[in-house]
Protein backbone atom coordinates (compact mmCIF):
# COMPACT_ATOMS: atom_id res chain seq x y z
CA UNK A 1 0.00 0.00 0.00
CA UNK A 2 1.43 3.36 -1.03
CA UNK A 3 0.58 7.03 -1.52
CA UNK A 4 1.34 9.56 -4.25
CA UNK A 5 0.10 12.78 -5.82
CA UNK A 6 -1.26 13.30 -9.33
CA UNK A 7 -1.32 16.48 -11.40
CA UNK A 8 -3.11 16.95 -14.71
CA UNK A 9 -0.43 18.70 -16.76
CA UNK A 10 -2.41 18.93 -20.01
CA UNK A 11 -5.69 17.55 -21.31
CA UNK A 12 -5.57 18.41 -25.02
CA UNK A 13 -5.09 15.94 -27.84
CA UNK A 14 -2.51 14.16 -25.69
CA UNK A 15 -3.29 13.63 -22.02
CA UNK A 16 -0.33 14.38 -19.75
CA UNK A 17 -0.57 13.23 -16.15
CA UNK A 18 2.26 13.60 -13.64
CA UNK A 19 2.54 11.16 -10.75
CA UNK A 20 4.96 11.63 -7.88
CA UNK A 21 7.04 8.72 -6.67
CA UNK A 22 4.96 6.20 -4.73
CA UNK A 23 5.74 6.45 -1.01
CA UNK A 24 5.16 4.06 1.88
CA UNK A 25 2.06 4.99 3.82
CA UNK A 26 3.15 6.58 7.12
CA UNK A 27 0.39 4.95 9.16
CA UNK A 28 0.74 1.42 7.71
CA UNK A 29 4.34 1.22 6.41
CA UNK A 30 5.93 -1.90 4.99
CA UNK A 31 8.85 -1.35 7.37
CA UNK A 32 9.40 1.03 10.31
CA UNK A 33 9.78 4.63 9.16
CA UNK A 34 10.41 6.14 12.58
CA UNK A 35 11.53 5.43 16.10
CA UNK A 36 9.31 4.84 17.98
CA UNK A 37 7.53 3.01 15.12
CA UNK A 38 4.19 4.73 15.71
CA UNK A 39 5.63 8.24 15.38
CA UNK A 40 5.25 8.28 11.57
CA UNK A 41 1.52 7.61 11.98
CA UNK A 42 1.25 10.44 14.52
CA UNK A 43 2.75 12.85 11.98
CA UNK A 44 0.13 11.71 9.44
CA UNK A 45 -2.58 12.58 11.97
CA UNK A 46 -1.14 16.10 12.11
CA UNK A 47 -0.77 16.80 8.37
CA UNK A 48 -2.27 13.92 6.39
CA UNK A 49 -0.35 11.66 3.96
CA UNK A 50 3.21 12.89 3.38
CA UNK A 51 6.44 11.94 1.59
CA UNK A 52 8.20 9.33 3.71
CA UNK A 53 11.24 8.06 1.81
CA UNK A 54 14.06 9.92 0.08
CA UNK A 55 14.21 13.52 -1.13
CA UNK A 56 10.78 15.15 -0.60
CA UNK A 57 10.99 16.90 -4.01
CA UNK A 58 11.42 15.50 -7.51
CA UNK A 59 14.82 16.98 -8.38
CA UNK A 60 15.69 13.96 -10.51
CA UNK A 61 12.48 14.36 -12.51
CA UNK A 62 13.47 17.89 -13.47
CA UNK A 63 16.99 16.75 -14.33
CA UNK A 64 15.64 14.07 -16.67
CA UNK A 65 13.12 16.40 -18.31
CA UNK A 66 10.09 14.55 -16.91
CA UNK A 67 8.86 17.31 -14.60
CA UNK A 68 8.43 20.96 -15.59
CA UNK A 69 9.54 23.64 -13.14
CA UNK A 70 6.03 24.82 -12.28
CA UNK A 71 4.96 21.28 -11.36
CA UNK A 72 8.17 20.80 -9.39
CA UNK A 73 7.67 23.94 -7.30
CA UNK A 74 3.99 23.17 -6.62
CA UNK A 75 4.81 19.67 -5.38
CA UNK A 76 7.98 20.69 -3.51
CA UNK A 77 6.42 23.58 -1.60
CA UNK A 78 3.47 21.36 -0.66
CA UNK A 79 5.93 18.86 0.85
CA UNK A 80 7.97 21.54 2.62
CA UNK A 81 4.84 23.16 4.01
CA UNK A 82 3.80 19.81 5.45
CA UNK A 83 7.17 19.54 7.20
CA UNK A 84 6.68 22.95 8.82
CA UNK A 85 3.14 22.04 9.90
CA UNK A 86 4.50 18.84 11.45
CA UNK A 87 6.96 20.87 13.52
CA UNK A 88 4.30 23.37 14.59
CA UNK A 89 1.96 20.54 15.55
CA UNK A 90 4.63 18.81 17.61
CA UNK A 91 5.56 22.06 19.38
CA UNK A 92 1.92 22.56 20.33
CA UNK A 93 1.67 19.04 21.79
CA UNK A 94 4.48 19.10 24.34
CA UNK A 95 7.81 20.56 25.42
CA UNK A 96 10.74 18.99 23.60
CA UNK A 97 14.36 18.74 24.70
CA UNK A 98 15.40 18.88 21.04
CA UNK A 99 13.35 19.36 17.88
CA UNK A 100 15.05 19.22 14.47
CA UNK A 101 13.55 20.38 11.16
CA UNK A 102 15.43 19.98 7.87
CA UNK A 103 14.16 21.95 4.84
CA UNK A 104 15.67 21.55 1.36
CA UNK A 105 13.93 24.67 0.03
CA UNK A 106 16.91 26.97 -0.55
CA UNK A 107 19.16 24.08 -1.63
CA UNK A 108 16.73 22.97 -4.34
CA UNK A 109 16.08 26.51 -5.55
CA UNK A 110 19.79 27.21 -6.02
CA UNK A 111 20.31 23.98 -7.94
CA UNK A 112 17.50 24.53 -10.43
CA UNK A 113 16.95 28.28 -10.71
CA UNK A 114 20.43 29.83 -10.60
CA UNK A 115 20.68 30.23 -14.37
CA UNK A 116 17.47 32.26 -14.53
CA UNK A 117 18.92 35.03 -12.38
CA UNK A 118 22.49 35.00 -13.70
CA UNK A 119 23.16 36.56 -17.16
CA UNK A 120 26.68 35.08 -17.07
CA UNK A 121 25.33 31.52 -16.98
CA UNK A 122 25.50 29.70 -20.34
CA UNK A 123 21.94 28.45 -19.77
CA UNK A 124 20.56 31.93 -19.09
CA UNK A 125 17.35 32.67 -20.99
CA UNK A 126 16.09 36.23 -20.64
CA UNK A 127 12.52 35.25 -21.57
CA UNK A 128 12.31 32.51 -18.95
CA UNK A 129 14.20 34.66 -16.49
CA UNK A 130 11.13 36.83 -16.12
CA UNK A 131 9.21 33.89 -14.65
CA UNK A 132 11.94 32.24 -12.59
CA UNK A 133 14.62 34.80 -11.75
CA UNK A 134 13.20 35.46 -8.27
CA UNK A 135 12.75 31.80 -7.28
CA UNK A 136 15.89 31.74 -5.12
CA UNK A 137 14.81 34.93 -3.35
CA UNK A 138 11.35 33.41 -2.95
CA UNK A 139 12.91 30.38 -1.24
CA UNK A 140 14.80 32.55 1.25
CA UNK A 141 11.70 34.64 2.00
CA UNK A 142 9.53 31.54 2.44
CA UNK A 143 12.00 29.90 4.84
CA UNK A 144 12.31 33.17 6.76
CA UNK A 145 8.51 33.41 7.10
CA UNK A 146 8.25 29.81 8.34
CA UNK A 147 11.07 30.43 10.81
CA UNK A 148 9.12 33.39 12.15
CA UNK A 149 6.08 31.17 12.69
CA UNK A 150 8.17 28.59 14.53
CA UNK A 151 9.88 31.14 16.79
CA UNK A 152 6.54 32.76 17.61
CA UNK A 153 5.12 29.42 18.75
CA UNK A 154 8.27 28.32 20.59
CA UNK A 155 8.50 31.40 22.80
CA UNK A 156 11.42 33.28 24.30
CA UNK A 157 12.71 30.55 26.63
CA UNK A 158 14.05 28.27 23.88
CA UNK A 159 17.33 28.48 21.98
CA UNK A 160 16.96 28.35 18.20
CA UNK A 161 19.83 27.38 15.90
CA UNK A 162 19.52 28.07 12.18
CA UNK A 163 22.27 26.29 10.25
CA UNK A 164 22.99 25.30 6.67
CA UNK A 165 25.55 22.69 5.74
CA UNK A 166 26.69 24.69 2.71
CA UNK A 167 26.06 27.72 0.53
CA UNK A 168 25.69 27.76 -3.25
CA UNK A 169 27.62 28.81 -6.35
CA UNK A 170 26.86 28.94 -10.09
CA UNK A 171 28.04 26.08 -12.30
CA UNK A 172 29.10 27.48 -15.67
CA UNK A 173 31.33 24.63 -16.82
CA UNK A 174 31.20 20.85 -16.25
CA UNK A 175 34.35 18.79 -15.83
CA UNK A 176 34.82 15.03 -16.10
CA UNK A 177 37.51 14.01 -13.63
CA UNK A 178 37.64 10.34 -14.56
CA UNK A 179 37.94 11.26 -18.23
CA UNK A 180 40.81 13.56 -17.21
CA UNK A 181 42.45 10.70 -15.29
CA UNK A 182 42.03 8.50 -18.37
CA UNK A 183 43.63 11.16 -20.58
CA UNK A 184 46.70 11.08 -18.33
CA UNK A 185 46.94 7.29 -18.34
CA UNK A 186 45.93 6.92 -14.69
CA UNK A 187 42.61 5.22 -15.49
CA UNK A 188 41.78 2.65 -18.18
CA UNK A 189 38.22 1.82 -19.38
CA UNK A 190 37.28 -1.84 -19.46
CA UNK A 191 34.96 -1.59 -22.42
CA UNK A 192 34.19 0.47 -25.49
CA UNK A 193 30.83 2.26 -25.29
CA UNK A 194 29.05 4.88 -27.39
CA UNK A 195 30.02 8.52 -26.91
CA UNK A 196 28.23 10.05 -23.94
CA UNK A 197 27.87 6.74 -22.10
CA UNK A 198 29.73 5.68 -18.96
CA UNK A 199 32.23 2.82 -19.23
CA UNK A 200 33.33 0.53 -16.42
CA UNK A 201 36.98 0.42 -15.44
CA UNK A 202 39.77 -2.08 -16.04
CA UNK A 203 41.01 -2.29 -12.46
CA UNK A 204 44.10 -4.33 -13.33
CA UNK A 205 45.42 -1.36 -15.32
CA UNK A 206 43.75 1.53 -13.46
CA UNK A 207 45.90 3.37 -10.92
CA UNK A 208 43.45 6.06 -9.76
CA UNK A 209 39.74 6.80 -10.01
CA UNK A 210 37.25 9.41 -8.84
CA UNK A 211 34.19 8.40 -6.83
CA UNK A 212 31.27 10.38 -5.44
CA UNK A 213 31.72 14.14 -5.52
CA UNK A 214 35.27 14.54 -6.71
CA UNK A 215 37.52 12.67 -4.28
CA UNK A 216 40.18 10.42 -5.82
CA UNK A 217 41.21 6.96 -4.63
CA UNK A 218 44.42 5.27 -5.69
CA UNK A 219 44.14 1.58 -6.55
CA UNK A 220 46.53 0.47 -3.81
CA UNK A 221 47.69 -3.14 -3.71
CA UNK A 222 46.65 -4.82 -0.46
CA UNK A 223 43.92 -2.25 0.20
CA UNK A 224 41.81 -2.60 -2.94
CA UNK A 225 40.62 -5.98 -4.31
CA UNK A 226 42.59 -5.61 -7.58
CA UNK A 227 45.19 -3.09 -6.51
CA UNK A 228 47.84 -2.03 -9.02
CA UNK A 229 49.77 0.64 -7.06
CA UNK A 230 52.46 -0.50 -4.64
CA UNK A 231 52.18 1.06 -1.17
CA UNK A 232 54.97 3.17 0.24
CA UNK A 233 57.18 5.29 -2.01
CA UNK A 234 55.39 4.42 -5.31
CA UNK A 235 52.04 5.35 -3.75
CA UNK A 236 53.33 8.69 -2.45
CA UNK A 237 55.03 9.48 -5.76
CA UNK A 238 51.80 8.85 -7.65
CA UNK A 239 49.82 11.02 -5.24
CA UNK A 240 52.26 13.87 -5.78
CA UNK A 241 52.24 13.40 -9.55
CA UNK A 242 48.44 13.49 -9.84
CA UNK A 243 48.18 16.48 -7.50
CA UNK A 244 50.69 18.45 -9.60
CA UNK A 245 48.89 17.53 -12.81
CA UNK A 246 45.52 18.60 -11.41
CA UNK A 247 46.89 22.00 -10.39
CA UNK A 248 48.38 22.43 -13.88
CA UNK A 249 45.08 21.60 -15.64
CA UNK A 250 43.78 24.57 -17.65
CA UNK A 251 40.43 25.12 -19.33
CA UNK A 252 41.33 25.53 -23.03
CA UNK A 253 38.39 27.88 -23.58
CA UNK A 254 38.96 30.26 -20.66
CA UNK A 255 42.61 29.68 -19.81
CA UNK A 256 41.67 29.35 -16.13
CA UNK A 257 43.03 26.69 -13.81
CA UNK A 258 40.27 24.16 -13.17
CA UNK A 259 41.55 22.96 -9.78
CA UNK A 260 42.62 25.54 -7.17
CA UNK A 261 43.81 23.21 -4.41
CA UNK A 262 44.58 19.53 -3.86
CA UNK A 263 44.75 18.10 -0.35
CA UNK A 264 45.66 14.63 0.82
CA UNK A 265 42.80 12.74 2.41
CA UNK A 266 44.37 12.79 5.87
CA UNK A 267 44.57 16.60 5.70
CA UNK A 268 40.78 16.77 5.33
CA UNK A 269 39.43 13.91 7.41
CA UNK A 270 40.31 12.97 10.98
CA UNK A 271 39.97 9.69 12.81
CA UNK A 272 40.14 6.39 10.94
CA UNK A 273 40.86 7.41 7.35
CA UNK A 274 42.10 4.04 6.09
CA UNK A 275 39.22 3.70 3.65
CA UNK A 276 39.01 7.39 2.84
CA UNK A 277 40.13 9.18 -0.33
CA UNK A 278 43.78 9.68 -1.14
CA UNK A 279 43.33 13.07 -2.81
CA UNK A 280 40.65 15.73 -2.39
CA UNK A 281 40.78 18.37 -5.15
CA UNK A 282 38.89 21.66 -4.95
CA UNK A 283 37.43 23.01 -8.20
CA UNK A 284 37.47 26.66 -9.15
CA UNK A 285 34.19 28.47 -8.45
CA UNK A 286 32.04 28.22 -11.57
CA UNK A 287 33.10 24.65 -12.38
CA UNK A 288 31.24 21.52 -11.31
CA UNK A 289 31.37 17.77 -11.85
CA UNK A 290 29.61 16.37 -14.88
CA UNK A 291 27.17 13.57 -14.21
CA UNK A 292 27.76 9.90 -14.93
CA UNK A 293 31.17 9.29 -13.35
CA UNK A 294 30.35 9.34 -9.63
CA UNK A 295 30.03 5.56 -9.37
CA UNK A 296 33.58 4.98 -10.58
CA UNK A 297 32.95 5.01 -14.32
CA UNK A 298 34.34 7.14 -17.11
CA UNK A 299 32.41 9.11 -19.72
CA UNK A 300 33.37 8.15 -23.27
CA UNK A 301 33.79 10.40 -26.29
CA UNK A 302 33.17 13.62 -24.42
CA UNK A 303 35.44 16.67 -23.91
CA UNK A 304 37.02 16.93 -20.48
CA UNK A 305 35.26 20.28 -19.95
CA UNK A 306 31.91 21.36 -21.44
CA UNK A 307 29.53 24.29 -21.09
CA UNK A 308 26.81 23.57 -18.53
CA UNK A 309 23.49 23.37 -20.37
CA UNK A 310 21.94 21.01 -17.82
CA UNK A 311 19.01 21.85 -15.50
CA UNK A 312 21.49 21.63 -12.57
CA UNK A 313 22.72 25.22 -12.90
CA UNK A 314 23.89 25.92 -9.35
CA UNK A 315 25.44 23.71 -6.71
CA UNK A 316 27.66 23.11 -3.74
CA UNK A 317 29.04 19.63 -4.32
CA UNK A 318 32.06 20.88 -6.24
CA UNK A 319 34.21 19.81 -4.58
CA UNK A 320 34.94 23.42 -3.59
CA UNK A 321 36.96 25.32 -1.05
CA UNK A 322 34.87 25.83 2.10
CA UNK A 323 35.29 29.59 1.65
CA UNK A 324 33.49 29.37 -1.72
CA UNK A 325 30.40 27.62 -0.34
CA UNK A 326 30.19 28.99 3.19
CA UNK A 327 26.91 28.32 4.95
CA UNK A 328 24.86 30.15 7.56
CA UNK A 329 24.71 29.75 11.33
CA UNK A 330 22.45 31.85 13.56
CA UNK A 331 21.83 31.40 17.30
CA UNK A 332 18.91 33.08 19.03
CA UNK A 333 17.59 32.61 22.54
CA UNK A 334 18.17 33.18 26.25
CA UNK A 335 21.75 34.06 27.09
CA UNK A 336 22.83 34.47 23.46
CA UNK A 337 24.41 37.86 22.80
CA UNK A 338 25.38 39.55 19.55
CA UNK A 339 28.92 38.52 18.68
CA UNK A 340 28.77 35.19 20.54
CA UNK A 341 29.10 33.20 17.32
CA UNK A 342 32.68 33.39 15.98
CA UNK A 343 33.17 34.54 12.41
CA UNK A 344 34.75 31.22 11.41
CA UNK A 345 32.23 28.82 12.90
CA UNK A 346 32.40 25.34 11.38
CA UNK A 347 29.74 22.73 10.75
CA UNK A 348 31.47 20.37 13.18
CA UNK A 349 30.80 22.94 15.94
CA UNK A 350 27.03 22.39 15.79
CA UNK A 351 26.89 19.02 17.59
CA UNK A 352 29.03 20.23 20.54
CA UNK A 353 26.86 23.36 20.74
CA UNK A 354 23.65 21.33 20.89
CA UNK A 355 25.13 19.01 23.52
CA UNK A 356 26.21 22.02 25.59
CA UNK A 357 22.70 23.50 25.46
CA UNK A 358 21.32 20.15 26.63
CA UNK A 359 23.72 20.16 29.57
CA UNK A 360 25.80 17.32 28.16
CA UNK A 361 29.53 17.04 27.54
CA UNK A 362 30.81 16.29 24.05
CA UNK A 363 32.72 12.98 23.74
CA UNK A 364 36.47 13.40 23.57
CA UNK A 365 36.65 12.04 20.01
CA UNK A 366 34.19 14.56 18.60
CA UNK A 367 35.51 17.30 16.33
CA UNK A 368 34.56 20.94 16.87
CA UNK A 369 33.66 22.98 19.93
CA UNK A 370 30.58 24.63 21.37
CA UNK A 371 29.91 28.03 19.81
CA UNK A 372 28.82 29.28 23.24
CA UNK A 373 32.10 28.49 25.02
Residue ranges and their predicted role:
Residues 291-339, 347-349:
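Low-complexity, glycine/alanine/valine/leucine- and proline-rich hydrophobic stretches
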Residues 70-99, 109, 115-161, 166, ...:
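A long, amphipathic alpha-helix that forms part
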Residues 183-187, 222, 335, 356-363:
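Short, well-ordered loop/turn and helix-capping segments at boundaries between secondary-structure elements
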Residues 100-104:
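Short acidic, glycine-rich surface-loop motifs adjacent to enzyme active sites
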Residues 1-72, 145-306, 310, 352:
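Secreted, luminal/periplasmic, and some membrane-associated catalytic domains
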Residues 364-373:
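Cytosolic regulatory/linker segments at or just downstream of nucleotide-handling modules
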Residues 91-92, 206-210, 317-324:
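Short glycine/proline-enriched loop/turn "hinge" motifs that connect secondary-structure elements
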Residues 111, 120-124, 166, 310-317, ...:
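Histidine-centered active-site/metal-ligand motif
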